[in-house]
């Protein structure tokens, strides 16, 4: 009889990272009753603490909330990736202490009654904690919460810099088109991840990516049928440890049933596939000028809509968007009255439940990877409007590489002065809501493939089994 094993998961503090990490842990615990998992949770200074309310989580999964670390110039960090990496680094001593506290006595004795520490599973932004795993003489694995194409692009650029001596920032003029082996089509520099747009961020990002090679394997929240080209590229050489596509890892339950019920009742009254849903993630918000363009586009499109509209944090402050106290202060005069019979403007949105509702026919999205996987799972086509991080890359992949989305503005950056016109937004809404489009047909086919990937005999089911065998 094999001795039970314990894995320590360290997700980055963003809610999307934590949610997919929890789903990863649930999959592992469900597959092997000899696996025990401890999830170390870091709290962002401007966000609500994570609380586990999912009754379906195994008793073999334990959550430990780490003490808050002293912030280190967090408000002047240039992009979310750099912020997360610095934030995780500041928690290194707390991670070490937490692991010491959860180590079973059997690690100091020869008893086999308690789980042995088998390894760390680190978030894509937590690779600096490989040093801590080494102190405990256990291997590290990486959990890449984004897609295989982003992993491949980062790995490719890191190799160009470190092995070819190429200054990546010289390739990133806005008009350049790059040959990236993980993409079939030429890749426009205008849609590079935000962390590769200037010398300082690029250096920090690629230095971090180079640490991935020190892990024993990389779990990716994707599936073979969606990203076969990028996954085959990653498997084609020895530049990166073995990759295990284990997605889609999704939490399809609403976290606030009371708020969700009113929204879902409204959707119940709408015809099938008639509502376009606009939502831009936990960090997504727009200034007043852009909000008015969106409102104009919705009104002119004539489509029924459900719009999650969030207020931006104060200028220059790193904080989460919040709900408006009075929507009339930001929307065009009379908009709510004129659209009352066809639309609903909300704050927080139970996104998974909305995407799973039969009335939802299209999704105007920032193309965050969790949101993308939720939309594909439910067979809802996307109108791509990325905001930051690797979302521009995701949009390119969906629109150009895979034909699973239409474009609103693929090269949009939320920190730019660009205001997307109502005409461009309306055009995207009309296209994504076409009921007989090729995009909708492809999305429906991918929805079926995403569900098959997770069941016995599916590609991700088999890949997860190989990972369990390894640990």
From Swiss-Prot:
GO MF entries: UDP-glucosyltransferase activity
The keyword Transferase appears for this protein: yes
Keywords: Glycosyltransferase, Transferase
Binding site for UDP-alpha-D-glucose: 282, 348-349, 366-374, 388-391
Thermal dependence: Optimum temperature is 30 degrees Celsius.
Statement: the UniProt record of this protein carries the keyword NAD: no
EC number(s) stated in the UniProt entry for this protein: 2.4.1.-
Protein name: UDP-glycosyltransferase 71A15
Source organism (scientific name): Malus domestica
